[in-house]
């Protein structure tokens, strides 16, 4: 967790972009921009949290897919990694590229 919450990361970052003919906007709970990749972390409070990726609510996967698409336009050439932080357990769960691609706008 240290790097995701360290001095190089930012909290509560507004995001606006265009995906196709749609304007999308949101607020990133946490973002870490590195040389070759971008991490976006969204805090979730589900009780109990999902144990496996297949149990993650579809609306969360779609939200992260939208963030990923918008951030890919802002940071071309960098891998965008989407992570959910289940706050009740302080547990990170990265959403797979396959699942994000399937939910992409």
Q: Locations of the language-model features?
A:
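Structural signature of nuclease core domains in nucleic-acid processing machines
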Residues: 1-105
